[in-house]
Structures are given as C-alpha cells and as structure tokens.
C-alpha cells in the first residue's frame, strides 16, 4: 500500500494525478465551505481523464475530497462518467450519513440521522439505517454488471474503512455489526476497528 501524503486530500491528489506532493496543487486538507475541500483545477489531468480519452467508461464510488458540489474538482469534471459517494472528506467520516451524492444530485438516506449543525454532512449518526459501505459495494457491483463486454472500464472504489468517525470520539468506529468481536473484552472502538478490517 502506498500513500502520497499523511493526510487524505493530498494523498488522493497524488494517486489521481501521478505527481508527488512537491508538484501537486493540493498539499493539505483545506476545507471550502459550505462543503468540500480545495478543488482540483480544470486543467489538472487525472488518471480518470487518461482512461476516458482511451475509450474507457469511468466511475468513482466512495470518497472523493478533491472538490465539492459545483466546483472544478467535482468527479464528473475530472474524468469520471459516474460518481456515487462522498464529496467532502469530513462527511466521509460518517458511515451512516444522511445523504450521499450520485453525480451532482444529493441522494437522501432515509433513517440515517446525524447531528449535522454545519450542514456539510459531517457528524455522528444517532439514527442508523443504511450503512454507506454496503451502498457503495452495491453501486460498484451494479456499475460492473452494466458494462459492455466490448468496452473497457475503470472503476475507482474509494472506501474509507477502517477510518474512524473523528466526530464520534470513542464511538467513532461505526459498523453495523461487531461480528466475531461482539463478545471480546475490548473497548468498543477496538472491537469496531477489528470488525471493519476482518
């Protein structure tokens, strides 16, 4: 596993552009209000754009964090034909979000309730009905199933497991089920982390 930086946005920028952080435009997790991070510029060449130019169908499912709604960094403006997931990194800390995005449309997730005072989707879920990673897995499988066998595709599946919900404190390892670790005599956060990675 390789990470181009110690934090999310610059590391993803390195992966998407092929440049090291000395040459990338995104070098930190700089937020842009009301939602999102500093966006990739229009002229930035991404791996998705390279695939698209070569005739591939392209999709990003999961976490983005390189441009919020309507920005030059939005995945649909950076070479991805299809996007489903989180635009904002802090929003992606929550595995039971009130909404995700499908392309540029907000998709409400009924039954998920988040203490979300800033309006950017970040916070800790108090109502948990739909687990985001199950939704992302379903979307990824559907994207693959819908592909034409005669046309290549590129799918960037960007899951955040086992990232803790930083806004959740000690409750931050949100999983639908602790599985084999439910009866372990460990702190809840450690049992949640073990369930995420196994």
Predicted segments, located by residue:
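Formylglycine-dependent sulfatase
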Residues: 1-198
């Amino acid at each position: 596993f390789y990470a181009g930086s110690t934090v999310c946005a610059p590391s993803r920028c390195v992966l998407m552009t092929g440049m090291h952080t000395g040459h990338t435009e995104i070098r930190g997790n700089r937020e842009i209000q009301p939602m999102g991070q500093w966006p990739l510029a229009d002229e930035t060449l991404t791996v998705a754009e390279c695939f698209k130019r070569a005739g591939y169908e392209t999709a990003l499912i999961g976490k983005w964090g390189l441009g919020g709604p309507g920005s030059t960094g939005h995945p649909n403006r950076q070479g991805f034909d299809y996007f489903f997931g989180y635009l904002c990194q802090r929003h992606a800390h929550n595995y039971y979000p009130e909404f995700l995005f499908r392309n540029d449309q907000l998709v409400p997730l009924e039954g998920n309730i988040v203490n979300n005072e800033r309006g950017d989707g970040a916070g800790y879920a108090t109502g948990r009905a739909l687990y985001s990673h199950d939704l992302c897995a379903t979307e990824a499988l559907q994207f693959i199933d819908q592909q034409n066998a005669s046309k290549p595709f590129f799918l960037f599946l960007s899951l955040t497991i086992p990232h803790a919900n930083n806004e959740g404190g000690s409750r931050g390892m949100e999983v639908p089920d602790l599985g084999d670790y439910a009866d372990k005599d460990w702190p809840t956060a450690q049992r949640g982390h073990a369930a995420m990675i196994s």
